[in-house]
């Protein structure tokens, strides 16, 4: 390869492109011959050929590029040829002389013209192992002599030997065990020695690889070694006498495993993916492929070189890419990448060790798929110069036309997506264009209503461009233009009233049959001959009617401003106008009648009921007037009393306070309590004025000093009736009964609690030798006892300090017993006298009561009791010689008692 001295590295891609252009130009001038350019294709292979292994590439010259050639092998069972001329192994086989030569046929599918070429395969020779020294002579390693005494003289020790490592090639074929070296001590002449080796590969994992003859010291290897597993072994040799005493210091032996080219390069990925933009210049980086070799990377066995075996497709040039043979970087070397023509390239990449030596190196292949990415080098183009559409008038959100464009760029990318805009013909903005994201079409849509009577047709100028600008250097205009002709279709429109609403002013009180106004509608369809008829749609008070032909509105009742259907002096009525088109359409209009007030309502007294005291002092009645008319037909008002009956003016007097209020007072000093109806004449200020006699109901009652009524009727009038009073009393009685029942229940519970304190709680009786019974039999025969001695000690001195908790009454307290004076006091309500009497009564009346000699339970009764010893407990002999074995027959409940008195062990 020649090199231009002094050329900067930045000019190398340019020089490569110029060189390629010159080569292509010269190739076009030279005469092209269709067929195989070589007579024989040869390849050097290893002995074992694997299935699918690429062997070589046969080139076929297709001058015009239009021939469709089909390849065929003369040995189809062993070899096949791909469309790009790459020869593959169909099956795995060892390479021999029968596979050394075969033919490749190429045939034109259209003309049936046929060509052939010979292929010769040769076996790769075995790499000579000059570095491995195989000698029949076994090297001897002697232990270095130590410092010691010999014949009474000191001898000088030699310096430590530097024992060179032993080089052993991997994958040796033996025979095994294979002798490596002999280890010997110079003392073996005088002593019987034993030799051994230690370390990984000997007595440590992996064990058994190296062995030594203990007598001769011969070190041997027992199996082939693999450098990729262990590249170096470090052993130590030992020499001892027959008693196991160390004779020599251990020496180190290093065994290096020499690498052989026994591993093919392996790509990190079998398929590599990369991208390159279309239109990229030569020298553009694409991707990097990487392979690894398990052999020694510092030797030729692990030094890899890359190359491109094939490129598919081969357009526009069969060498669009190149690869750096050392780094694996793939770059472009030719111009003309066009995604619209070729979207993807497939490269077969080969990695070979031995620095790429095709004779001795091992190879492997991988696939590099390079995708040509899109750039915006094609603007959108309309498929037609003019598009047509139509739309009914007054319709919005209607698609009137679909604008179609073509774009050769990659679909659904910013370089393909079209953006439409209206550049002319729509000054009022009645149309808009949206892009269909799936089809990329432009949808012309009406966004504002269109009136046929105003515009019958629109001619729009539209433009389309991509979302991103065109790439630099593209010789196309950035946008495409077209026209859209939109026809407006006339439809039957609704009639409309004008003005709407229509407001008129009329006085109230107009008689029926009065013509108010003419309320007509207009038909916007000027080019349609249609008639309009009118009907009443809404008339809350039913005061109006409309002529169906001319729209005259006439009253059918008297208009009253004070009607509840009149709001803020305005009465609303709605009318409907319908045409006879197809389909018929209608419109509504509202007539608002502003009613002017007239003095047609007499004033009334307010309030209509009042109360006052029997005497003129201390209060009066304030009154006013209510008039449904408005000014000037309302206040100020004039208040007066009628002349008859005569007692009205005799008993009452009225005083005007201002134009709206007056005050009614008693004229006499006393008026009997009761209800009186006082007529009052009220006159408004209308023209002419309107008067009215209004009745005021006055309640005269007895009053207190504050002027408030004090009779019962006032309570009733306040809203508290007899039923409510009875209900309140019943609730109070029920509440008192509940409180009383609760008090009784609490007292009864306290009494029961005091009675239960006299009994022994079964849970508190933890003694195993005494059982508590509810019935105590006949009790004591001696009935002469003092009940005062049976009172509880707590009842004698209530102020005494009581211990915390519940004290058992049937056991002696553990603290010092207080001395209580003997006194004949009346039995305390809390004593147990009643309890004993009830027990005696039950025993006398019950013939089945237990005998007197039964076990009884007594509560602790305090000291100072006058009662003697309990005869029922002393009736039996207290001697210890009695037989208590019968207690064992009483069952498990008496087991503890039987153990205590029956002479048990425990």
Curated annotation (Swiss-Prot):
This is Cadherin-2. Keywords: Calcium, Cell adhesion, Cell junction, Cell membrane, Cleavage on pair of basic residues, Glycoprotein, Membrane, Metal-binding, Phosphoprotein, Repeat, Signal, Transmembrane, Transmembrane helix. It is a single-pass type I membrane protein. Residues 160-724 are extracellular. Pfam families: CADH_Y-type_LIR, Cadherin, Cadherin_pro. Residues 746-906 are cytoplasmic. Residues 26-159 form a propeptide. Ca(2+) 1 binds at residues 170, 226, 228, 262. The keyword Isomerase does not apply. Residues 160-267, 268-382, 383-497, 498-603, 604-714 form the Cadherin domain. SMART domains: CA, Cadherin_pro. Ca(2+) 2 binds at residues 170, 228, 259-260, 262, 295. Three calcium ions are usually bound at the interface of each cadherin domain and rigidify the connections, imparting a strong curvature to the full-length ectodomain. Calcium-binding sites are occupied sequentially in the order of site 3, then site 2 and site 1. Homodimer (via extracellular region). Can also form heterodimers with other cadherins (via extracellular region). Dimerization occurs in trans, i.e. with a cadherin chain from another cell. Interacts with CDCP1. Interacts with PCDH8; this complex may also include TAOK2. The interaction with PCDH8 may lead to internalization through TAOK2/p38 MAPK pathway. Identified in a complex containing FGFR4, NCAM1, CDH2, PLCG1, FRS2, SRC, SHC1, GAP43 and CTTN. May interact with OBSCN (via protein kinase domain 2). Interacts with FBXO45. Residues 863-880 have a biased composition (Low complexity). The modification Phosphoserine is found at residues 96, 135.
């Amino acid at each position: 390869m020649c090199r231009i001295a002094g050329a900067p590295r930045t000019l190398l891609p340019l020089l490569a492109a110029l060189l390629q252009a010159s080569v292509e130009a010269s190739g076009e001038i030279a005469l092209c011959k269709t067929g195989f350019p070589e007579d024989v294709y040869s390849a050097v292979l290893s002995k074992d050929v694997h299935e699918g292994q690429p062997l070589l590439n046969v080139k076929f010259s297709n001058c015009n590029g239009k021939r469709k050639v089909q390849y065929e092998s003369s040995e189809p069972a062993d070899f096949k040829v791909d469309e790009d001329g790459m020869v593959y192994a169909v099956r795995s086989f060892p390479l021999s002389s029968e596979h050394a030569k075969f033919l490749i046929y190429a045939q034109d599918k259209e003309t049936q013209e046929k060509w052939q070429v010979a292929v010769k395969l040769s076996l790769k020779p075995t790499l000579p192992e000059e570095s491995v020294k195989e000698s029949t002579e076994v090297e001897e390693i002697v232990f270095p002599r130590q410092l010691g005494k010999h014949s009474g003289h000191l001898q000088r020790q030699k310096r430590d030997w530097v024992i060179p490592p032993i080089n052993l090639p991997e994958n040796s074929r033996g025979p095994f065990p294979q002798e490596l070296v002999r280890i010997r001590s110079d003392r073996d002449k005088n002593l019987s020695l034993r030799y051994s080796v230690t370390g990984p590969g000997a007595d440590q994992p992996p064990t058994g690889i190296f062995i030594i003859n203990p007598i001769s010291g011969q070190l041997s290897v027992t199996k082939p070694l693999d450098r990729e597993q262990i590249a170096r072994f470090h052993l130590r040799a030992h020499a001892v006498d027959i008693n196991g005493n160390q004779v020599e210091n251990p020496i180190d032996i290093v065994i290096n495993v020499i690498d052989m080219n026994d591993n093919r390069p392996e790509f990190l990925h079998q398929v590599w993916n990369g991208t390159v933009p279309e239109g990229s210049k030569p020298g553009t980086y694409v991707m990097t492929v990487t392979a690894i070799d398990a052999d020694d990377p510092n030797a030729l066995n692990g030094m890899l070189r890359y190359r491109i075996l094939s490129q598919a497709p081969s357009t526009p040039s069969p060498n669009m890419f190149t690869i750096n043979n050392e780094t694996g970087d793939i770059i472009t070397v030719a111009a003309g990448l066009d995604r619209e023509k070729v979207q993807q390239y497939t490269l077969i990449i080969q990695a070979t060790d031995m620095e790429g030596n095709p004779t001795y190196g091992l190879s492997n292949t991988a696939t590099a798929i390079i995708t040509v990415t899109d750039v915006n080098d094609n603007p959108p183009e309309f498929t037609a110069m003019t598009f047509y559409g139509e739309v009914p008038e007054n319709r919005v959100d209607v698609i009137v036309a679909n604008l179609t464009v073509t774009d050769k760029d990659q679909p659904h990318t910013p370089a393909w997506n079209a953006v439409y805009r209206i550049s002319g013909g729509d000054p009022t903005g009645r149309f808009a264009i949206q892009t269909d994201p799936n089809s990329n079409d432009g949808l012309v849509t009406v966004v504002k209503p269109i009136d046929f009577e105003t515009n019958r047709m629109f001619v729009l100028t539209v433009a389309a461009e991509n979302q991103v600008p065109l790439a630099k250097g593209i010789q196309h205009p950035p946008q495409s233009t077209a026209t859209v002709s939109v026809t407006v279709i006339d439809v039957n429109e609704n009639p409309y009233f004008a003005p709407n609403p229509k407001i008129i002013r009329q006085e109230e009180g107009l008689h029926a049959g009065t013509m108010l106004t003419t309320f007509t509608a207009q038909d916007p369809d000027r080019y349609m001959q249609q008639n309009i008829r009118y009907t009443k749609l809404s008339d809350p008070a039913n005061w109006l009617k409309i002529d169906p032909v001319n729209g005259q509105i006439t009253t059918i009742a008297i208009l009253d401003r004070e009607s509840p259907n009149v709001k803020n002096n305005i009465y609303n009525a709605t009318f409907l106008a319908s045409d006879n088109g197809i389909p018929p359409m209608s419109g509504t209009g509202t007539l608002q009648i502003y009613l002017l007030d007239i003095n047609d309502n007499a004033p009334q007294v307010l309030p209509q009921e009042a109360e006052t005291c029997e005497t003129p002092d201390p209060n009066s009645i304030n009154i006013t007037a209510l008039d449904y008319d408005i000014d000037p037909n309302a206040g100020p008002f004039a208040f007066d009393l009628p002349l008859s009956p005569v007692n009205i003016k005799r008993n009452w007097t009225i005083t005007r306070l201002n134009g709206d209020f007056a005050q009614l007072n008693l004229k006499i000093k006393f008026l009997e309590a009761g209800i009186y109806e006082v007529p009052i004449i009220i006159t408004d200020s209308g023209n002419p004025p309107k008067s009215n006699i209004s009745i005021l109901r006055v309640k005269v009652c007895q009053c207190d000093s504050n002027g408030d009524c004090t009779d019962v009727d006032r309570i009733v009038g306040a809203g508290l009736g007899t039923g409510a009073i009875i209900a309140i009393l019943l609730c109070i009685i029920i509440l008192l009964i509940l409180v009383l029942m609760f008090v009784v229940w609490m007292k009864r519970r306290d009494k029961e609690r005091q009675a239960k304190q006299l009994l022994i709680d079964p849970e508190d009786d933890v003694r195993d030798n005494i059982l508590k019974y509810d019935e105590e039999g006949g009790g004591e025969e001696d009935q002469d006892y003092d009940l005062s001695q049976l009172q509880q000690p707590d009842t004698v001195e209530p102020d005494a300090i009581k211990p915390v908790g519940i004290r058992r009454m049937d056991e002696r307290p553990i603290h010092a017993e207080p001395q209580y004076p003997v006194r004949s006091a009346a039995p305390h309500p809390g004593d147990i006298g009643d309890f004993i009497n009830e027990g005696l009564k039950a025993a006398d009346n019950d013939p089945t009561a237990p005998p007197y000699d039964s076990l009884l339970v007594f509560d602790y009764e305090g000291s100072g009791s006058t009662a003697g010893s309990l005869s029922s407990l002393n009736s039996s002999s207290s001697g210890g010689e009695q037989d208590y074995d019968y207690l064992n027959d009483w069952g498990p409940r008496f087991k503890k008692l039987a153990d205590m008195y029956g002479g048990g062990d425990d």
